[in-house]
């Protein structure tokens, strides 16, 4: 079936994302071939399983996982039988949707993925013959007539090595094919989704009568990948999923189908246990401000939501598993996790859409650590410990589209938005203390500016307002904040900071100067750093401005670097080792514990605390997964 252009849903979504009218994009539907090449048919037979989309009697799409018997791919699984047709002989299990939806002459779509190499190919068409074995109801055979095929983008496939696993005992753990309005997904399934890095996305296009001849009805099956947890679940209703779209090949057939029929299926696989979660529901695409209300930090691509109306969860089903002793290699193109607005525990505050801040000062502490000060013309509300979200589009411009970028894969989803913890703030001003990231686009630009001024116009460092560098202020985020004090009480805190992870604590210390609760703050801090001569002056400066009657502050400094002479007023104990179990065992762990630093540092501290009986749920953490 040669395509005649974009159908009504594809035209709608392309209009929403401003692809319409671009001559370089308008003809991309011609990339979709109407006939399956025999070589591609062989590729499908070499895949370990075939995700397909079918429809139930209500017209809802369901994703199915068709696998070879015993998990061994080859010609006995999928074979080419000529004239753009595939014969599939598959092992299935109780709960597999095709056992309910399978029939002759049904529409079908599939995607073959070779996970060790990230190759993939999409197919769609119809089923001319469907049979379920009489002697074994868990074997199905179908002949697919393929009239749409495209070798699609491999960018977000997480590489993994798979092996046959024939010793399976599939069991339907829970199933609800039709959810009532007040029902939600069980917590077990929500956690399963949040632990996944891959989803198989099924879609359906039901042609309006006036377009049926030109754009016939069809199904779609696609794959979406990202970091673990890239698909989020609303805890408000427990059944709405949010799938962010990333920079891709810009064909948008899956989103176009959703735009037309507002239905989709999500199918998740646990490659280590063989568990499979099948979801179907009502879907919609959100763009621009509508998307940002749900997921504030998502880039300019669409956000797709799925309101689940039915599900099946099967354990130990897939006769293929991730090869023992191998790790998943995440796609280098995957952007950082983006969370729902509701997940920020009510601590995300957005600003006006066009609010800007002015760069007013630069403090260079070393060649790679500096503080940048910004001023706002409108009042700011920032809780000590929160992070500022800035857009650097005005300074750097939008990143140009490229389909692939092997030398810098992260650049493809770079929306020029960055987040840093605020290190100082007042009603109209805030500061960001940061470390320059090697090859970092944004920190590179900021530090290049600072170093250039230091060389040629050092007097400008103390007042950069004349440069008129205005940045977009998106908002402030985070719940890593000081606890609310009870008037007249004593607040005991234990802070663990790794490197530049000291910045939220810097903000908290500076805020204590203004605390009028009458509380006594008793703070022990363990700081691990390679730059004590940079970080210590900033800490001692923050501590020195607080009246001694308010705060007791003790610092355990862990560093292998030489430490300068300290002020007599500073209570610092210097250790030439790393934060270890011995230190944790000898500190008062009844204090409220905060932890901020790079992942290895965070993991070391959490492991030490766990050995002392303090679980991760008792620790307030902040990482750098912005």
What residues fall within each predicted segment?
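C-terminal edge-of-domain segments
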Residues: 1-48, 122-240, 257-261, 275-384, ...
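A short mixed-secondary-structure module that forms the rim of ligand-binding clefts
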Residues: 47-50, 60-118, 224-271
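Short conserved beta-strand and strand-loop elements enriched in small hydrophobics
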Residues: 52-54, 107-115, 201, 264-269, ...
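Classical protein tyrosine phosphatase
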Residues: 55, 60-62, 70-74, 98-100, ...
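Short, structured patches in soluble enzyme cores that scaffold and shape functional sites
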Residues: 90-92, 112-115, 125-129, 145-148, ...
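Extended C-terminal subregions enriched in glycine
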Residues: 243-248, 252-260, 265-280, 295-297, ...
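FNR/FR-type flavoprotein reductase catalytic core
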Residues: 244, 253, 276, 431, ...
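Ferredoxin-reductase
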Residues: 350-467, 527-531, 540-543, 558-562
């Amino acid at each position: 079936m040669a395509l005649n252009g974009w159908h009504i849903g594809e035209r709608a979504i392309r209009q929403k994302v401003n692809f319409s009218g671009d001559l370089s994009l308008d003809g991309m539907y011609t990339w979709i071939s109407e006939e399956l090449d025999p070589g591609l048919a062989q590729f499908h037979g070499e895949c370990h399983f075939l995700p397909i989309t079918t429809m139930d009697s209500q017209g809802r799409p369901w994703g199915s996982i068709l696998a070879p018997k015993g998990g061994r791919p080859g010609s006995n699984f999928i074979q080419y039988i000529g004239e753009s047709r595939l014969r599939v002989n598959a092992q299935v299990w109780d709960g597999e949707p095709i056992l309910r939806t399978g029939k002759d002459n049904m529409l079908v779509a599939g995607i073959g993925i070779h996970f060790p190499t990230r190759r993939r190919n999409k197919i769609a068409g119809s089923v001319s013959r469907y049979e379920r074995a009489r002697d074994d109801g868990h074997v199905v055979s179908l002949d697919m007539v393929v009239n749409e095929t495209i070798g699609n983008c491999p960018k977000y496939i997480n590489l993994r090595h798979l092996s046959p696993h024939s010793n399976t005992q599939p069991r339907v753990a829970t199933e609800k094919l039709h959810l009532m309005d007040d029902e939600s997904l069980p917590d077990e399934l929500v956690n399963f989704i949040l632990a996944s890095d891959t989803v198989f996305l099924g879609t359906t296009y039901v042609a309006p009568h006036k377009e049926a001849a030109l754009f016939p009805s069809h199904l779609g099956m696609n794959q979406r990948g990202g970091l673990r947890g890239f698909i989020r679940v609303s805890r408000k209703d427990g059944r709405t999923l949010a799938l962010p779209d990333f920079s891709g090949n810009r064909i948008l057939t899956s989103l176009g189908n959703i735009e037309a029929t507002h239905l989709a299926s999500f199918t998740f696989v646990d490659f280590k246990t063989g568990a499979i979660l099948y979801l179907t529901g009502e879907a919609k695409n959100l763009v621009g401000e509508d998307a940002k209300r749900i997921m504030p930090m998502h880039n300019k691509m669409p956000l797709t939501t799925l309101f689940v109306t039915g599900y099946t969860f099967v354990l130990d089903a897939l006769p293929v598993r991730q090869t023992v002793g191998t790790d998943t290699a995440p796609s280098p193109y995957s952007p950082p996790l983006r969370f729902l607005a509701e997940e920020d525990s009510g601590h995300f505050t957005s600003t006006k859409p066009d609010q800007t801040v002015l760069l007013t000062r630069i403090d260079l502490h070393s060649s790679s650590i500096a503080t940048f000060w910004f001023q706002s013309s409108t009042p700011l509300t920032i809780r000590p410990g929160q992070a500022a979200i800035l857009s650097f589009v005005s300074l750097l411009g939008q990143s140009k589209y490229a389909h692939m970028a092997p030398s810098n894969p992260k650049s493809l989803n770079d929306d020029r938005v960055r987040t840093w913890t605020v290190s100082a703030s007042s009603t109209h001003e805030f500061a960001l203390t940061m470390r320059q990231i090697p090859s970092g686009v944004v920190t590179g630009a900021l530090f290049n500016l600072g170093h250039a001024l230091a060389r040629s116009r050092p007097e400008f460092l103390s007042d950069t307002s004349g440069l008129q560098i205005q940045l977009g202020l998106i908002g402030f985020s985070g719940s890593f904040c000081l606890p609310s004090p009870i008037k007249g009480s004593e607040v005991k805190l234990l802070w663990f900071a790794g490197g530049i992870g000291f910045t939220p604590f810097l903000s908290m210390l500076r805020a204590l100067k203004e605390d009028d609760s009458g509380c006594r703050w008793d703070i022990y801090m363990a700081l691990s750093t390679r730059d004590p001569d940079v970080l210590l002056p900033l800490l001692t400066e923050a501590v020195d401005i607080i009246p001694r009657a308010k705060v007791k502050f003790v610092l355990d400094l862990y560093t292998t670097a030489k430490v300068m002479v300290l002020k007599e007023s500073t209570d610092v104990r210097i250790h030439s080792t790393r934060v270890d179990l011995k230190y944790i065992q000898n500190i008062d762990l009844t204090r409220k514990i905060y932890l901020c630093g790079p992942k290895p540092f965070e993991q070391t501290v959490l492991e030490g605390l766990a050995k002392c009986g303090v679980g991760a749920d008792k620790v307030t953490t902040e990482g750098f997964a912005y």
